[in-house]
Amino acid sequence: MKNFVCLIVSFFLLGITAYSQDKEPEVQVVTSELKRIEIIRMRSGMDLLEGLNKAVKEKKLKNAVILAGIGSVTDYHFHVVSDKNLPPANQFTKASVPKDLTSVQGYILNGRVHAHITLADENSVVGGHLEPGTKALTFAIITIGVLSDELEIERFDKYKF
């Protein structure tokens, strides 16, 4: 009987361990230094996401932080979360009106761009997750801080429910 109870407790503990490993930690932290800074300038008419992806490929960037971005756009396309469900629904916004590009932030995770933009004119400020179709008006300048290729940060852009 004692062995049977131990066996049941072991299965119970194994179940808890497996369940715990499947759960995402509340906080994940990695430490790194910047290897270098890349400053990317995109000319008028360039799609911002396409330009970022082109620079990532050309410079062979694996992990990086998008530190800043400025410029102006003729067209924009972004999405924002639109409810509290997991996974959340997305609301997409697309327009063909000029706005100032006041901020670009994000990450390059295992070579994949995840960027957010903020746009403004004299009446409003809008922004969200950068989508294809956001095109530079005068220009766009985006500054990227390159991190170590060894960092395991791709998981930061994934979520579990």
Protein language model regions, located:
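Sec/Tat signal peptide C-region and signal peptidase I cleavage site
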Residues: 16-20
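N-terminal intrinsically disordered, cationic/polar leader segments
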Residues: 21-57, 62-68, 74-114, 119-161
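Positively charged n-region of N-terminal signal peptides that target proteins for export
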Residues: 1-4
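Bacterial N-terminal signal peptides
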Residues: 6-15
